[in-house]
Protein backbone atom coordinates (compact mmCIF):
# COMPACT_ATOMS: atom_id res chain seq x y z
CA UNK A 1 0.00 0.00 0.00
CA UNK A 2 1.45 3.33 -1.07
CA UNK A 3 1.94 6.02 1.58
CA UNK A 4 -0.56 8.85 1.12
CA UNK A 5 1.14 12.17 1.89
CA UNK A 6 -0.43 15.54 2.62
CA UNK A 7 1.06 16.92 -0.59
CA UNK A 8 -0.65 14.16 -2.62
CA UNK A 9 -3.99 14.99 -1.00
CA UNK A 10 -3.40 18.69 -1.69
CA UNK A 11 -2.56 18.02 -5.34
CA UNK A 12 -5.72 15.95 -5.85
CA UNK A 13 -7.84 18.62 -4.15
CA UNK A 14 -6.31 21.29 -6.41
CA UNK A 15 -7.25 19.20 -9.44
CA UNK A 16 -10.80 18.34 -8.38
CA UNK A 17 -12.07 20.82 -5.74
CA UNK A 18 -13.23 17.76 -3.77
CA UNK A 19 -13.18 17.78 0.08
CA UNK A 20 -9.85 16.87 1.67
CA UNK A 21 -11.16 13.70 3.35
CA UNK A 22 -12.72 12.49 0.10
CA UNK A 23 -9.40 13.08 -1.65
CA UNK A 24 -7.56 11.06 0.99
CA UNK A 25 -10.08 8.21 0.77
CA UNK A 26 -9.84 8.14 -3.02
CA UNK A 27 -6.03 8.09 -2.96
CA UNK A 28 -6.06 5.30 -0.39
CA UNK A 29 -8.50 3.25 -2.47
CA UNK A 30 -6.42 3.91 -5.59
CA UNK A 31 -3.19 2.97 -3.78
CA UNK A 32 -1.70 6.38 -4.52
CA UNK A 33 -2.54 6.43 -8.25
CA UNK A 34 -3.53 10.05 -8.92
CA UNK A 35 -5.43 9.40 -12.17
CA UNK A 36 -7.38 6.49 -10.67
CA UNK A 37 -8.20 8.56 -7.57
CA UNK A 38 -9.51 11.37 -9.76
CA UNK A 39 -11.75 8.91 -11.60
CA UNK A 40 -13.05 7.50 -8.29
CA UNK A 41 -13.96 11.00 -7.14
CA UNK A 42 -15.89 11.61 -10.35
CA UNK A 43 -17.85 8.42 -9.71
CA UNK A 44 -18.62 9.35 -6.11
CA UNK A 45 -19.12 13.09 -6.45
CA UNK A 46 -20.21 13.50 -10.07
CA UNK A 47 -19.20 16.59 -12.03
CA UNK A 48 -18.26 18.47 -8.85
CA UNK A 49 -15.01 16.55 -8.87
CA UNK A 50 -14.21 17.54 -12.45
CA UNK A 51 -14.43 21.32 -12.15
CA UNK A 52 -10.74 21.87 -11.68
CA UNK A 53 -9.44 18.78 -13.47
CA UNK A 54 -8.11 20.93 -16.31
CA UNK A 55 -5.69 22.79 -14.07
CA UNK A 56 -2.14 22.38 -15.24
CA UNK A 57 0.85 22.94 -12.97
CA UNK A 58 3.90 22.72 -15.26
CA UNK A 59 5.48 25.98 -16.45
CA UNK A 60 6.31 27.16 -19.95
CA UNK A 61 4.82 28.91 -22.96
CA UNK A 62 2.92 28.11 -26.14
CA UNK A 63 3.49 30.29 -29.17
CA UNK A 64 2.41 30.20 -32.82
CA UNK A 65 3.48 31.62 -36.17
CA UNK A 66 1.52 31.86 -39.43
CA UNK A 67 3.02 32.86 -42.77
CA UNK A 68 0.41 32.58 -45.49
CA UNK A 69 -0.59 28.94 -45.91
CA UNK A 70 2.09 27.60 -43.53
CA UNK A 71 2.12 27.73 -39.77
CA UNK A 72 3.81 26.37 -36.69
CA UNK A 73 2.91 26.01 -33.02
CA UNK A 74 5.22 24.93 -30.22
CA UNK A 75 5.27 24.36 -26.47
CA UNK A 76 8.46 25.09 -24.57
CA UNK A 77 8.72 24.10 -20.91
CA UNK A 78 10.78 25.58 -18.10
CA UNK A 79 11.01 25.20 -14.34
CA UNK A 80 9.41 28.38 -12.99
CA UNK A 81 6.87 31.01 -14.00
CA UNK A 82 9.61 33.63 -13.67
CA UNK A 83 11.37 32.41 -16.82
CA UNK A 84 8.16 32.56 -18.90
CA UNK A 85 8.38 36.35 -18.64
CA UNK A 86 12.04 36.54 -19.65
CA UNK A 87 12.52 38.41 -22.95
CA UNK A 88 15.27 36.09 -24.19
CA UNK A 89 13.22 32.98 -23.44
CA UNK A 90 10.19 34.45 -25.24
CA UNK A 91 12.31 35.49 -28.23
CA UNK A 92 13.61 31.93 -28.57
CA UNK A 93 10.07 30.54 -28.29
CA UNK A 94 8.76 32.83 -31.02
CA UNK A 95 11.72 32.01 -33.25
CA UNK A 96 11.14 28.28 -32.73
CA UNK A 97 7.51 28.59 -33.89
CA UNK A 98 8.69 30.47 -36.98
CA UNK A 99 11.30 27.79 -37.74
CA UNK A 100 8.65 25.07 -37.42
CA UNK A 101 6.43 26.92 -39.91
CA UNK A 102 9.19 27.54 -42.43
CA UNK A 103 11.14 24.27 -42.26
CA UNK A 104 8.73 21.55 -41.03
CA UNK A 105 11.38 19.68 -38.98
CA UNK A 106 10.84 15.96 -38.47
CA UNK A 107 11.35 15.97 -34.70
CA UNK A 108 12.80 17.90 -31.73
CA UNK A 109 16.37 17.03 -32.72
CA UNK A 110 15.83 18.29 -36.28
CA UNK A 111 14.28 21.49 -34.93
CA UNK A 112 17.27 22.08 -32.66
CA UNK A 113 19.67 21.63 -35.57
CA UNK A 114 18.14 24.49 -37.58
CA UNK A 115 20.27 27.66 -37.98
CA UNK A 116 19.47 30.36 -35.42
CA UNK A 117 21.48 32.89 -33.42
CA UNK A 118 20.41 34.96 -30.42
CA UNK A 119 22.04 36.70 -27.43
CA UNK A 120 25.48 35.76 -28.73
CA UNK A 121 24.62 32.06 -28.88
CA UNK A 122 24.42 29.87 -31.99
CA UNK A 123 24.75 28.79 -34.72
CA UNK A 124 21.74 26.49 -34.10
CA UNK A 125 18.53 26.74 -32.10
CA UNK A 126 19.80 24.00 -29.79
CA UNK A 127 22.95 26.04 -29.12
CA UNK A 128 20.77 29.01 -28.21
CA UNK A 129 18.71 26.84 -25.85
CA UNK A 130 21.82 25.57 -24.09
CA UNK A 131 23.24 29.07 -23.94
CA UNK A 132 20.10 30.47 -22.32
CA UNK A 133 20.09 27.64 -19.78
CA UNK A 134 23.53 28.80 -18.68
CA UNK A 135 22.60 32.49 -18.81
CA UNK A 136 19.25 32.24 -16.98
CA UNK A 137 20.20 29.34 -14.73
CA UNK A 138 17.15 27.20 -15.36
CA UNK A 139 16.43 24.18 -17.51
CA UNK A 140 14.18 24.62 -20.55
CA UNK A 141 13.10 22.20 -23.26
CA UNK A 142 11.16 22.01 -26.50
CA UNK A 143 8.31 19.68 -25.59
CA UNK A 144 6.14 19.40 -28.72
CA UNK A 145 5.36 21.21 -31.95
CA UNK A 146 3.23 20.90 -35.06
CA UNK A 147 3.63 22.14 -38.62
CA UNK A 148 0.54 23.19 -40.58
CA UNK A 149 0.16 23.36 -44.37
CA UNK A 150 -2.09 22.08 -47.14
CA UNK A 151 -5.38 21.79 -45.26
CA UNK A 152 -6.98 25.14 -45.96
CA UNK A 153 -6.32 28.55 -44.46
CA UNK A 154 -4.93 29.05 -40.95
CA UNK A 155 -6.14 31.04 -37.96
CA UNK A 156 -4.29 31.11 -34.65
CA UNK A 157 -5.19 32.33 -31.17
CA UNK A 158 -2.98 32.63 -28.10
CA UNK A 159 -4.52 33.12 -24.68
CA UNK A 160 -1.60 34.76 -22.95
CA UNK A 161 1.29 32.35 -23.30
CA UNK A 162 -0.33 29.28 -21.73
CA UNK A 163 -2.93 28.26 -24.32
CA UNK A 164 -2.47 28.11 -28.09
CA UNK A 165 -4.91 27.14 -30.84
CA UNK A 166 -4.38 26.65 -34.56
CA UNK A 167 -7.45 26.23 -36.78
CA UNK A 168 -7.40 24.92 -40.36
CA UNK A 169 -10.44 26.21 -42.23
CA UNK A 170 -12.17 27.36 -45.39
CA UNK A 171 -14.28 30.51 -45.43
CA UNK A 172 -14.44 33.66 -43.32
CA UNK A 173 -11.26 34.74 -41.51
CA UNK A 174 -13.05 36.51 -38.64
CA UNK A 175 -15.32 33.54 -37.96
CA UNK A 176 -12.32 31.18 -37.91
CA UNK A 177 -10.53 33.47 -35.44
CA UNK A 178 -13.64 33.42 -33.24
CA UNK A 179 -13.66 29.62 -33.36
CA UNK A 180 -10.00 29.53 -32.33
CA UNK A 181 -10.87 31.71 -29.35
CA UNK A 182 -13.83 29.45 -28.56
CA UNK A 183 -11.60 26.35 -28.63
CA UNK A 184 -9.19 27.96 -26.17
CA UNK A 185 -12.08 28.63 -23.79
CA UNK A 186 -14.15 25.44 -24.18
CA UNK A 187 -11.41 22.91 -25.04
CA UNK A 188 -13.27 20.48 -27.34
CA UNK A 189 -11.52 17.23 -28.18
CA UNK A 190 -12.95 16.76 -31.69
CA UNK A 191 -14.90 18.61 -34.38
CA UNK A 192 -17.85 16.21 -34.33
CA UNK A 193 -19.11 13.69 -31.76
CA UNK A 194 -18.26 10.85 -34.15
CA UNK A 195 -14.60 11.93 -34.06
CA UNK A 196 -14.17 11.66 -30.27
CA UNK A 197 -11.51 8.98 -29.54
CA UNK A 198 -12.93 5.62 -28.46
CA UNK A 199 -10.77 5.45 -25.33
CA UNK A 200 -12.27 8.71 -24.03
CA UNK A 201 -15.79 7.44 -24.71
CA UNK A 202 -15.12 4.18 -22.87
CA UNK A 203 -13.61 6.05 -19.94
CA UNK A 204 -16.73 8.21 -19.71
CA UNK A 205 -18.94 5.12 -19.98
CA UNK A 206 -17.02 3.52 -17.10
CA UNK A 207 -17.51 6.63 -14.97
CA UNK A 208 -21.25 6.68 -15.73
CA UNK A 209 -21.52 2.96 -14.91
CA UNK A 210 -19.60 3.49 -11.68
CA UNK A 211 -21.93 6.32 -10.68
CA UNK A 212 -24.95 4.11 -11.40
CA UNK A 213 -23.48 1.38 -9.21
CA UNK A 214 -22.94 3.87 -6.37
CA UNK A 215 -26.59 4.93 -6.69
CA UNK A 216 -27.69 1.28 -6.55
CA UNK A 217 -25.73 0.68 -3.36
CA UNK A 218 -27.18 3.83 -1.80
CA UNK A 219 -30.73 2.77 -2.71
CA UNK A 220 -30.22 -0.68 -1.18
CA UNK A 221 -28.73 0.82 1.98
CA UNK A 222 -31.80 3.04 2.34
CA UNK A 223 -34.16 0.11 1.78
CA UNK A 224 -35.28 1.39 -1.60
CA UNK A 225 -35.77 -0.65 -4.75
CA UNK A 226 -32.91 -0.13 -7.26
CA UNK A 227 -33.76 1.06 -10.76
CA UNK A 228 -34.37 -1.67 -13.38
CA UNK A 229 -31.36 -2.66 -15.49
CA UNK A 230 -32.85 -1.17 -18.67
CA UNK A 231 -33.30 2.21 -16.95
CA UNK A 232 -29.72 2.08 -15.67
CA UNK A 233 -28.48 1.27 -19.18
CA UNK A 234 -30.36 4.28 -20.56
CA UNK A 235 -28.89 6.51 -17.85
CA UNK A 236 -25.38 5.36 -18.71
CA UNK A 237 -25.90 5.90 -22.43
CA UNK A 238 -27.48 9.28 -21.72
CA UNK A 239 -24.41 10.28 -19.75
CA UNK A 240 -22.15 9.27 -22.63
CA UNK A 241 -24.22 11.22 -25.16
CA UNK A 242 -24.17 14.28 -22.91
CA UNK A 243 -20.38 14.02 -22.71
CA UNK A 244 -20.07 13.74 -26.50
CA UNK A 245 -22.08 16.93 -26.97
CA UNK A 246 -19.97 18.74 -24.39
CA UNK A 247 -16.62 17.87 -25.99
CA UNK A 248 -17.42 18.07 -29.72
CA UNK A 249 -16.83 21.50 -31.26
CA UNK A 250 -19.89 21.56 -33.52
CA UNK A 251 -22.28 20.77 -30.63
CA UNK A 252 -20.89 23.27 -28.14
CA UNK A 253 -22.78 26.54 -27.51
CA UNK A 254 -20.76 29.28 -29.23
CA UNK A 255 -18.84 31.17 -26.55
CA UNK A 256 -19.71 34.60 -28.01
CA UNK A 257 -23.40 33.76 -28.46
CA UNK A 258 -24.66 30.76 -26.51
CA UNK A 259 -28.04 30.93 -28.28
CA UNK A 260 -26.45 29.08 -31.20
CA UNK A 261 -24.03 26.19 -31.54
CA UNK A 262 -20.64 26.54 -33.18
CA UNK A 263 -21.96 24.50 -36.11
CA UNK A 264 -24.85 26.94 -36.58
CA UNK A 265 -22.52 29.93 -36.41
CA UNK A 266 -20.19 28.41 -38.99
CA UNK A 267 -23.05 27.56 -41.33
CA UNK A 268 -24.32 31.15 -41.17
CA UNK A 269 -20.80 32.40 -41.95
CA UNK A 270 -20.34 29.89 -44.80
CA UNK A 271 -17.21 28.61 -43.05
CA UNK A 272 -15.99 25.06 -42.38
CA UNK A 273 -13.38 23.81 -39.91
CA UNK A 274 -11.01 21.23 -41.41
CA UNK A 275 -9.05 20.61 -38.24
CA UNK A 276 -7.74 22.20 -35.06
CA UNK A 277 -4.90 21.77 -32.60
CA UNK A 278 -5.03 22.89 -28.97
CA UNK A 279 -1.94 23.16 -26.78
CA UNK A 280 -2.18 23.88 -23.05
CA UNK A 281 1.10 24.41 -21.23
CA UNK A 282 2.05 21.36 -19.19
CA UNK A 283 -0.91 19.27 -20.31
CA UNK A 284 -0.25 15.69 -19.29
CA UNK A 285 2.87 16.58 -17.29
CA UNK A 286 2.93 15.79 -13.59
CA UNK A 287 4.70 18.51 -11.67
CA UNK A 288 6.98 17.30 -8.90
CA UNK A 289 5.38 18.13 -5.54
CA UNK A 290 7.78 18.01 -2.63
CA UNK A 291 6.78 16.35 0.63
CA UNK A 292 8.40 18.96 2.87
CA UNK A 293 7.85 17.01 6.11
CA UNK A 294 9.66 14.01 4.65
CA UNK A 295 12.39 16.27 3.27
CA UNK A 296 13.01 17.88 6.67
CA UNK A 297 13.02 14.48 8.39
CA UNK A 298 15.58 13.22 5.88
CA UNK A 299 17.79 16.26 6.46
CA UNK A 300 17.62 15.81 10.24
CA UNK A 301 18.49 12.12 9.91
CA UNK A 302 21.41 12.96 7.63
CA UNK A 303 22.68 15.56 10.09
CA UNK A 304 22.53 13.08 12.97
CA UNK A 305 24.36 10.46 10.92
CA UNK A 306 27.10 12.93 10.09
CA UNK A 307 27.52 14.03 13.73
UniProtKB/Swiss-Prot annotation:
PANTHER family named among the record's database cross-references: ELONGATION FACTOR TS, ELONGATION FACTOR TS, MITOCHONDRIAL
Function: Associates with the EF-Tu.GDP complex and induces the exchange of GDP to GTP. It remains bound to the aminoacyl-tRNA.EF-Tu.GTP complex up to the GTP hydrolysis stage on the ribosome.
GO CC field: cytoplasm
PROSITE patterns on file: EF_TS_2 (PS01127)
Residue stretches in coiled coil: none
Primary gene name: tsf
Locations listed in the record: Cytoplasm
HAMAP family, per the entry: EF_Ts
Similarity-based family: Belongs to the EF-Ts family.
UniProt keywords, alphabetically: Cytoplasm, Elongation factor, Protein biosynthesis
Organism: Variovorax paradoxus (strain S110)
Major localization class: cytoplasm
InterPro entries assigned: EF-Ts_dimer_sf, Transl_elong_EFTs/EF1B, Transl_elong_EFTs/EF1B_dimer, Transl_elong_Ts_CS, UBA-like_sf
Protein name listed in UniProt: Elongation factor Ts
Region of interest: Involved in Mg(2+) ion dislocation from EF-Tu: 80-83
Single GO term (MF): translation elongation factor activity
Amino acid sequence: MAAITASMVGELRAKTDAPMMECKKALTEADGNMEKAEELLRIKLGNKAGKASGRITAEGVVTAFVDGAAGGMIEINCETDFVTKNDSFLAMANAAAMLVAKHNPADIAALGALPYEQDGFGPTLEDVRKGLIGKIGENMSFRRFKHFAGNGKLASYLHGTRIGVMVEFEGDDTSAKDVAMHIAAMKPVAIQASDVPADLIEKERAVAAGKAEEDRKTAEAEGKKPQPAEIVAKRIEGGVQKYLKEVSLHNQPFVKNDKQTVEQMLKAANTSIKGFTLYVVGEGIEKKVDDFAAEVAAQVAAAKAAA
